[in-house]
Design a protein with these regions (language model features):
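Walker B catalytic acidic pair
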Residues: 300, 306-307, 318
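Conserved alpha-helical scaffold flanking the Walker A/P-loop in AAA+ ATPase domains
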Residues: 208, 264-265, 270, 280-303, ...
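Basic, amphipathic alpha-helical bundle interface domains used for macromolecular binding and assembly
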Residues: 40-45, 60, 67-77, 289-290, ...
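Conserved inter-motif catalytic segment of the P-loop NTP-binding fold
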Residues: 245-279, 286-287, 393, 433-442, ...
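Catalytic P-loop NTPase motifs of RecA-like helicase/translocase cores
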Residues: 112, 305-312, 355
C-alpha cells in the first residue's frame, strides 16, 4: 500500500512542498529513502523505527520505500522524521483517517517518540498557507513562530502518539493563536540607553543622522573612547520594526535555528557583532547548500564590525555587493540563492596599531609605515560605501565626573522616527524606505541644492579629493540632516555638516 504525506523543505529562506510517499511491499525488511536525501534524512530510518516501536505501534517487517518528491532538489535536515513515520503508520493501516492530506507536517523524532524542534518553521507555515492547506502540524517549540501566519491552523505537538490520536479522531488539538500587537508591545524594551554615554555629543549627533537616514557609519578613535558602547546603543534609536520587516527578519533567524522558542517574532532590530577572525562564508553566507551569513542575520538591523582593519581583507571586500544592493547572491553548481541583506553597517577602528595616534595624552609608538599599512587594510571602494565617518576623541574627565545625563534613547528615537516618516512619504510606492537607499534618479529629484551649496560642495571635493560616490553620499546625508530639521530644501549648513562626515577620506586613503 502507498501512503502520501505532505511535508516541506527549505530553499534559502523560503520553503517548498515535499510529498513524502511511503510504499510497503512484500520482500526483505529493507528501509530505503530516495529523492536526493542528505545524511540526516538517510539516518531518519533508525530514528523513525525506534520512535514507532517505543510509542507502542507495530513496525512493518516488510520492504519500505520512501520517496521525497520533487526528486531533483536535495533534501536536508531531520524535519522529515515525523511525516515519514506517519506515512508508514498510514500505509500499515494504523492511521485510518484521510484528513492527513489537509496538513503540512514537519518534526524531528527522538527515539522515544518525542517531537523535537526544526529550523524554518515560519517559512514552512507560509508555504502551507500559500498552498491553501487547512493547517500545519509542528513541534511545540516551533508553535509561536508559525502561529503568526494567519489563514491556517497551527497544531503544536509533543509526541508521535498525540499526532496519531488526532488523525484518528481520538483527541482534538486546539490551534495556537497569538496577538501580533501584544507581541510588539511586550518585546520592545532594551537593556541599554544613550543616556548612559558620558560626553561624545558630536558622535551622538552623527549616530542620530546615520539612524535617521539608514546610513553606514565608521568610528575612529583610541581605545576606551566609547566606540563599542555607542554602537551597542544604536538599535535603541532605530525606528520600530514593521510587521513585514519582523516577518522577513524572523524567517532568516528561524532558518538558522536562532529563534528562541519563547519568541514568535524578532521584534528588536538585530545587532550582530562577529569576531574579526570570521571567514568570508561566515560573513556573507555559504556552504554546499548556501546558508545566510552575518550580513543577512543583521538584515533590518545593525552589523557592527569592531576593529575593522583586523578583519581579513577579502572578507571586507566581499561586503561591497550587499552594501550596494541590499542583498547577497551565493552561487553553487547546483543552485543560486539570494538572501536579503539590507543592514546598517557600523564599523569601529583605532587610528593606528597601538591606538593612540590622535590621543593628546598618550604617546603613539607606531612608525609611519606601520600606520600606513594599518590604514591601507581598508580599501577606498569600501570606505566610499560608508556614508558617515566620525572621529571619537577620548572622553574628558569633566564629562565622566558629571552627574548630568545626556538625552535618552527615547528622545533621540522620536526625532529619528519623524525623519523616517518624512522619508516614507517621499518614497511611497518606490520600494525604498530611507535616504541611504536612494539611487541616481532619486538623488537628482530629491537632493537638489542651490548655487551657494554647489560652490561649497565643489571646493570640498577639490580639497579632499573625494570620489563621485562620495559626492552622492554627501547629498544623501545632507537630505537626512534636512529631514531631521523638517526642512523641505537642503541648505548650505546641511551640506557643511555632511562634508564633516567625509573628512576621514583624507586621512585613511
Amino acid at each position: 500500500m502507498i501512503a502520501k504525506v505532505l511535508s516541506g523543505g527549505l530553499l534559502g529562506i523560503d520553503a517548498y512542498l515535499v510529498e513524502v510517499e511511503v510504499d510497503i511491499s512484500l520482500g526483505l525488511p529493507i528501509f530505503s529513502t530516495v529523492g536526493l536525501p542528505d545524511g540526516a534524512v538517510k539516518e531518519s530510518k533508525d530514528r523513525v523505527k525506534s520512535a514507532v516501536k517505543n510509542t507502542g505501534y507495530d513496525f512493518p517487517s516488510q520492504r519500505i520505500t520512501v520517496n521525497l518528491a520533487p526528486a531533483d532538489i536535495k533534501k536536508e535536515g531531520a524535519a522529515f522524521d515525523l511525516p515519514i513515520a506517519l506515512g508508514i503508520l498510514t500505509a500499515s493501516d494504523t492511521i485510518l483517517s484521510t484528513s492527513i492530506k489537509d496538513y503540512l507536517i514537519v518534526g524531528e523524532l527522538s527515539l522515544d517518540g518525542r517531537v523535537k524542534s526544526i529550523h524554518g518553521g515560519l517559512s514552512l507555515a507560509v508555504a502551507a498557507r500559500n498552498s491553501h492547506l487547512k493547517g500545519i502540524i509542528v513541534p511545540k517549540d516551533n508553535a509561536l513562530e508559525t502561529s503568526v501566519v494567519k489563514g491556517i491552523d497551527v497544531l503544536a505537538v509533543e509526541h508521535l502518539s498525540q499526532v496519531v490520536d488526532f488523525l484518528n479522531g481520538i483527541h482534538e488539538i486546539t490551534p495556537i493563536k497569538v496577538d501580533i500587537e501584544s507581541i510588539f508591545n511586550t518585546q520592545s524594551a532594551y537593556p541599554v540607553d544613550f543616556s548612559e554615554v558620558k560626553g561624545q555629543e558630536h558622535a551622538k549627533r552623527s549616530i542620530e543622522v546615520a539612524a535617521a537616514g539608514g546610513h553606514n557609519l565608521i568610528m575612529v578613535g583610541p581605545p576606551g573612547a566609547g566606540k563599542t558602547m555607542l554602537a551597542k546603543r544604536i538599535p535603541t534609536i532605530l525606528p520600530r520594526m514593521s510587521f513585514e520587516e519582523a516577518l522577513e527578519t524572523t524567517k532568516i533567524h528561524s532558518v538558522m535555528g536562532l529563534l528562541e522558542p519563547t519568541k514568535a517574532l524578532v521584534t528588536h532590530k538585530p545587532f550582530r557583532s562577529p569576531h574579526h577572525t570570521i571567514s568570508d562564508a561566515g560573513l556573507i553566507g555559504g556552504g554546499t547548500i548556501p546558508k545566510p551569513g552575518e550580513v543577512s542575520l543583521s538584515h533590518n538591523g545593525v552589523l557592527f564590525l569592531d576593529e575593522l582593519p583586523e578583519f581579513k581583507k577579502n572578507a571586507l571586500e566581499v561586503m561591497r555587493q550587499p552594501l550596494e544592493d541590499g542583498k547577497v547572491t551565493i552561487s553553487r553548481a547546483v543552485s543560486s540563492l539570494t538572501y536579503p541583506a539590507r543592514f546598517m553597517l557600523v564599523a569601529a577602528m583605532n587610528p593606528c596599531p597601538c591606538g593612540f595616534y590622535s590621543d593628546p595624552h598618550q604617546e603613539c609608538t607606531c612608525t609611519l609605515p606601520q600606520i600606513q599599512r594599518y590604514k591601507a587594510k581598508i580599501s577606498g571602494p569600501l570606505l566610499d560605501r560608508i556614508d558617515i565617518h566620525v572621529e571619537i576623541p577620548p572622553v574628558r574627565f569633566r564629562d565622566l565626573s558629571t552627574e548630568r545625563t545626556g538625552e535618552t534613547s527615547k528622545q533621540i528615537k522620536e526625532r529619528v522616527e519623524k525623519a523616517r516618516t518624512i522619508q516614507q512619504e517621499r518614497f511611497k510606492g518606490k520600494k525604498i524606505y530611507c535616504n541611504a537607499q536612494m539611487v541616481s534618479r532619486h538623488i537628482r529629484k530629491y537632493c537638489q541644492i542651490d548655487e551657494s551649496s554647489q560652490r561649497l560642495l565643489e571646493r570640498a571635493m577639490e580639497k579632499l579629493g573625494l570620489s563621485a560616490r562620495a559626492y552622492t553620499r554627501i547629498l544623501k546625508v545632507s537630505r537626512t540632516i534636512a529631514d531631521l530639521e523638517e526642512e523641505d530644501h537642503i541648505q548650505p549648513h546641511h551640506i557643511s555638516e555632511a562634508i564633516q562626515y567625509r573628512s576621514l577620506d583624507r586621512t585613511l586613503l
